[in-house]
Amino acid sequence: MRYTITQSRLLYVLSINDRKHQGLLKIGEVFVDNDIADSKIRQELGKAVRAVLDARPYMQGVSYHIEYVECTTYDQDSKCYKADDVYRTLRAMDIPSKTLGKYKDPTTGQTEDADIWFACTIFDIQDVISKIKQGKGAGHGAIKFRPEQEKAIHDTVEYFQKEFKDPNKGKHYLWNAKMRFGKTLSGLEVAKRCGYRSTLIITHRPVVDKGWHDDFAKIFRTPEALADYHAKGLEPAYGRRMMDDNDSQGDFYTLTNEVDAGKKILVFFVSMQYLRLSQFVGGKERNFDPLKRAIMEYDWDFVMVDEAHEGIDAAAGVRVMNKLKKENTRILSLSGTPFNLLDKYEESEIYTWDYVMEQRAKLFWDEHHYGDPNPYADLPRMQILTFTLPKMLRDQAIQNNEVFKFHEFFRVYTEEDKLQLQKLIDNEPNVIKKAEYQAELAKVKIDKFVHEKAINRFLDKLVEESDTSLYPFSSDVFREHFRHTFWLLPGVKEAAALEQLLRKHEVFSEMFHIINAAGDGNIEDKNGSALADVLDNIRGNAKKNITKKDYTITLSCGKLTTGVSVPEWTAVLCMKGSENTPAANYMQTIFRVQTHAVLEGRQKSDCYVFDFAPDRALTAVAETAKMAVYAQTEKGKKQMKLTKKKEEEHLAAFIKLCPVLSMDEGEMGKHFSATQIFEKLSNVYIERAVRSGYADNSLYNPDQLMNLSPEQEKALGDVHDLLGSMPNAWKPEKINVNKNGLGDADAEQIKYIYYLSKSEVLPPRPSMAAKFDDNGMPTTEDEVWSDVMCAPVELFPYLFVSHSQLVNGEWSSFSNPVLWKKWENKEKDDKTAEAK
């Protein structure tokens, strides 16, 4: 196996000697390995083009002549042009073109014109190429949405403008669209086509304000759009917080007054963090801010929620959204991983575009679109490589623990460690034992790794050269491929400690500039400083006197894992998370490296995920496949009962387009098939049952139970008799394929409220809950709490339970209470109890 990061574009011009194509030339491009493109022999480039074209269905049996071919890399290997640039420049020069074919788009189902040829000469094309290289090519002009974007826009506009008998219908829509879909541009186009006068954009990433502002200009301030608005006496405006982008146009109150007066079209940008602080929704702001309330009280035509999976269903987010909802307000939620939102929408209210659809479209276009420029060509393919750490390192960090944990492997010494050891010394009567504790205390260095030797060996392993090693830095060639990478770690102190080791390491210190973006541990990059620091070091910033770094490693424990793009990153190293890590968080993180880029004049074609917890990677991939089926299956939404066949089909499609490979201690392993992934997950079925206390609903799925062998059935029965049942129905599934996972420190947190009742009717107040904070949300620091308080008794025989989950740092609203247990008189009915 070898790693591929970039490929080169070869532009070709061909002719077909028949009446239909007389006087016409086809311009296209293919991607080839860089060493082929570097050939200076034109005939070799022509052979490479033919090898690609002859394999395409539409070229079978076609006799053609290649008139011209060249590699599109130019300007000292720093830039490359595309076939699309040539098309646009030819059209700007009024060179006529002719469309000779039809193409049925699999996304929209629409038949469109295709197979574009130009009535020009080779000299015209060479002249255009020369202009492009001189920076005189045609600009991008009006935005042309890709087929899937056009369908998302069309379906959403149609839904919002449709009349429903049910007054609650037609008001909410969800885009389950992967990162890099273009949700901002497409969402703003919805606002434009619907003719909304007032649009509110809510984001959990205030730093992306500039991106929204730029996209606003592309939709609302093009010459054509402005001419149309001015003819109607309207002026489009973009505002944020108090001021408009043009301060002379006024503040929020002035802008909204002008909207109400029919003078302006307003797109207003605000962060969810800003709104939920308001006292108006029970927030913790010290001084009342009237602007927050004014924003929430305004009657918005259209509300777009960016990164909607991040806390929109948490209590604070719900309170904000409830204030924003008015009778005629339409709400569009945007997310690449809305796994926690899918059950809130019907199938007709969701548009889905995932990685599998994207990569299929990329392949389908090349095979069926007659060589026209591929709009998906820039989107890299992902590969996930799961590494099992060397046994030597695992054993050293595990010691007496049952499983390997990143949290333990990267654990740093704290003041608490010193205090605990000192207590042991003070209370130890045995002189020899006391001396051992004192020796251990002498080793303690605050904020340094407990297992520093093991981590240094791990770093050595990453760079250790051998003929079989596939660790990403184990050869000079690999280090060139992975010049800029993103490393995800368990916490701030762990990132700081690793930064110090990397700066001292023989290879990493000499070659790589280390960027610690962990900050204070907050996932938010409120002012964009972390992203700016990364980009400044990768690209250089003369104003800040920061030189360009050819090789960087960015360390983080959560910051920069969602909503941002660093095109130069070619790999992410995952050293945080567990089988409990939500698939949404995992996919958000790994897709940071899929941003398209031109690197040294070559197109970024592939990107990589190096995951050192194979169980977590497989679980996340399988869960993503499950959610993809769930999002597109009405029956699945209602019953949450997905067939194994459909899940396996989608998983097979995913790993075909995003290969998942297993590496045994850094050396070549094997590709996982969909069947193998599901087999591994099935092998831990009993373990999951034990961990969930038999309260996992999927354990009682007839389809699952039918697949158990007689031995597995007996094992399940034996363990159930031994452990009994526990109230953990809402706890996440914990799938551990091997002992290379993370520990409970990163497990999902859940809390409960209990209601005891004399009858099967839910009482109005809970019988016991944890303490409540100033906002009326339960806390978990109640020292007198015990499980006895949530047990049904003869006087109150019925127990109801409600739960809340910690999602992205915020507690969700408590679920509707359900009847959980009923008191039984075991002494009276001993035989029945024994039978049960």
Which residues does each PLM region occupy?
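Conserved RecA-like P-loop NTPase helicase motor core
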Residues: 28, 514-636
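Non-catalytic accessory segments flanking enzymatic or RNA/DNA-binding domains
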Residues: 1-147, 800
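Interdomain helical connector at the RecA1-RecA2 junction of SF1/SF2 helicase-like NTPases
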Residues: 343-485, 499
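Conserved helicase ATPase motor motifs in RecA-like P-loop NTPase domains
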Residues: 176-180, 309-311, 324-345
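Conserved Walker A/P-loop ATP-binding site and its immediately adjacent core
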Residues: 184-189, 193-227, 273-274, 489-496
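Walker A/P-loop
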Residues: 165-190
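Long, largely alpha-helical accessory region at the distal end of helicase-like NTP-driven motors
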Residues: 120, 124-141, 423-450, 454-457, ...
